[in-house]
Amino acid sequence: MNTVTFQGNPLHLEGELPVVGQKAPDFVLAANDLSPRGFKDYAGKVLVLVSVPSLDTPVCDMEVRRFNTEAAGLSDNVRIVAVSCDLPFAQARWCGAAGVKSVETLSDYKDTSFGK
């Protein structure tokens, strides 16, 4: 078990910390239309994964909006995907209200295994 410090307090993390250059484990998450998405769906692309608890929190909202702004200057070979535990329908609603079109949102609502 790994431990980090958060606001001066130890916080125990599940699993192992990633190592630079290590291949990330595959995942299955739900797209806004409820279809499954995994690494294979982004084959040949540079994939930037942004993990947030919920798009409806102020910091996460600001973070994903910023990634959306930055995405405008990236090549077509780059995909930015924000993963949250929000329901896919809530993600679609949030993207519409926030004007987010360059970041794809995927949901980990089924089993919350993505961050483990």
Predicted regions and their residues:
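Chalcogenol-based redox active-site neighborhoods
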Residues: M1-K116
